[in-house]
Amino acid sequence: MGQYKIWVDADACPNPIKEILFRAAERKSLPLVLVANQMLRVPPSPYISQVRVGSGFDVADQYIVNHVEPTHLVITADIPLAAQVIEKGALALNPRGELYTTDNIRQKLTMRDFMEDLRSSGVHTGGPDALSAADKQAFANSLDKWLVRV
């Protein structure tokens, strides 16, 4: 079993969530890897790194799936990526603090597919609400629960 590590699907991860993760990585001396198809600003730290992948559909997701291990945590709002991470035995947490599990991922995928079908048929479904202070707190609380095990 490898060491604990946090992976971030960083292209769509909100900056306030990245800031929480930067502080946690420093506090716990824990590797944090941000994967994106563009260069990101990350603080200088021996614990924080970034991987820039090529542009293209799901390139960052595939990189994460290829490198994730069961002791790792992946931060993503991408439900198909979360499903793949769970299949590999790792944990996935969204930026609003909701842990994806084997119990809830199938329902999440079904709802995502349903919403995608609605959008493709021309129905305007709107996007997610802006990240609130309560969302940031929920994320920090969920992250702390995982960090206690590290």
Curated annotation (Swiss-Prot):
Q: Which InterPro entries match?
A: UPF0178
Top-level taxon = Bacteria
Q: Where is the signal peptide?
A: none
Q: Which family does it belong to?
A: Belongs to the UPF0178 family.
- Would you tell me the protein name for this molecule? UPF0178 protein Shewana3_1627
Organism field: Shewanella sp. (strain ANA-3)
